């Protein structure tokens, strides 16, 4: 698992803008993965699982999610900027949804900051806004940004 955490951290470091403070640190990722209900997926350049011996720099994206009570929450979703606009995010989101459903998830959830470029991808995959948290995120430079919660599934 340590090698996979290295791969997750490499993508996260390149994909998340520090201005928004969305990236997790290594300890947060490791602590989440110790729990039996937290799952991750890695994506290579084709959006599929990379070879087990792939170097951290060869991983194009990842998801980290938590399952419980018939729901799966997408906690982190990232594609390295070098690999964006190639369908990797779309394929990774499809794989996430399929695997969540095999674990019994009837509803998929996520939260994002307003203005996140991935919003159109989420909408295209059936996610719908279900809530708004005004001024939820604070940027490093000070302004606050709303959080939007989305759901996809039988209860959205």
Region spans (language model):
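Short glycine/proline-centered loop/turn elements that form peptide/ligand docking sites
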Residues: 89, 93, 115-118, 135-141
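Acetyl-CoA-dependent GNAT
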Residues: 3, 7-84, 90-95, 99, ...
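Conserved GNAT acetyl-CoA-binding A-motif
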Residues: 100-111, 121
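Short phosphate-binding/catalytic loops that engage adenosine nucleotides
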Residues: 88, 105, 127
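Short Asp/Glu-rich motifs
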Residues: 31, 35, 119-120, 141-142
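Conserved catalytic-core motifs of GNAT/GCN5-like acyltransferases
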Residues: 109-111, 123, 128-146
């Amino acid at each position: 698992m340590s090698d996979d955490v290295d791969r997750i951290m490499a993508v996260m470091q390149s994909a998340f803008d520090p201005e928004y403070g969305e990236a997790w640190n290594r300890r947060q990722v490791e602590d989440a993965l110790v729990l039996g209900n937290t799952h991750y997926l890695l994506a290579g350049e084709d959006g599929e699982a990379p070879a087990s011996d792939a170097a951290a720099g060869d991983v194009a994206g990842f998801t980290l999610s938590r399952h419980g009570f018939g729901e799966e929450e997408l906690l982190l979703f990232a594609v390295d900027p070098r690999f964006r606009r190639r369908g990797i995010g779309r394929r990774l989101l499809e794989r996430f949804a399929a695997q969540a459903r095999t674990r019994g998830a009837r509803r998929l959830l996520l939260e994002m900051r307003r203005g996140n470029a991935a919003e159109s991808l989420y909408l295209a995959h059936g996610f719908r806004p279900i809530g708004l948290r005004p001024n939820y995120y604070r940027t490093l430079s000070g302004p606050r940004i709303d959080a939007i919660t989305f759901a996809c599934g039988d209860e959205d």
